[in-house]
């Protein structure tokens, strides 16, 4: 079983602003979010299939607790409440499908994958736009 535990720092990010745009975030808030999310602090604690993930930026901190295979509530990247279900796609990759609790919006999901090089790759998807963020352990 892969070990996602640790404190992670971002080394690369692609398409984050484009993702926020497709989610309908206005231009001013996008600029603030992109600046704040340029240096997130990510803490992951893992015990088997149970995860705690805390992501902190200068603008907001999010925390999620989940067990792979069990539905839980969280927020989409733009802050809308949703139900999420995480499954293992492969030995080192988890996939999360999100469903909005109310209202309409783009179909959203995320994945987290550990590479053989020790990088953590987070992808966030809204409809056809994919944002990729790459982290290394601190």
UniProtKB/Swiss-Prot annotation:
The record's subcellular locations are: Cytoplasm; Endoplasmic reticulum; Nucleus
Q: Which GO terms describe its molecular function?
A: cyclin binding; fatty acid binding; retinal binding; retinoic acid binding; retinoid binding; retinol binding
Q: Which GO terms describe its cellular component?
A: cytoplasm; cytosol; endoplasmic reticulum; extracellular exosome; nucleoplasm; nucleus
Ion transport among keywords? no
- Modification note: Sumoylated in response to retinoic acid binding, sumoylation is critical for dissociation from ER and subsequent nuclear translocation.
Q: Binding of all-trans-retinoate: at which residues?
A: 133-135
Keywords (alphabetical) are:
Cytoplasm, Endoplasmic reticulum, Isopeptide bond, Nucleus, Retinol-binding, Transport, Ubl conjugation, Vitamin A
Q: Which Gene3D superfamilies match?
A: 2.40.128.20
- Copy out the induction comment: By retinoic acid.
Chief location of this protein?
cytoplasm
Instruction: Show the cross-link location (Glycyl lysine isopeptide (Lys-Gly) (interchain with G-Cter in SUMO)).
Output: 102
**Which ranges belong to the motif Nuclear localization signal?**
21-31
Write out the similarity annotation.
Belongs to the calycin superfamily. Fatty-acid binding protein (FABP) family.
The UniProt function text for this chain reads: Transports retinoic acid to the nucleus. Regulates the access of retinoic acid to the nuclear retinoic acid receptors.
Q: What is known of its domains?
A: Forms a beta-barrel structure that accommodates hydrophobic ligands in its interior.
Q: What assembly does the database describe for this protein?
A: Interacts with RXR and RARA. Interacts with importin alpha.
What is the name attached to this protein's record?
Answer: Cellular retinoic acid-binding protein 2
Which organism is this protein's natural source? Homo sapiens
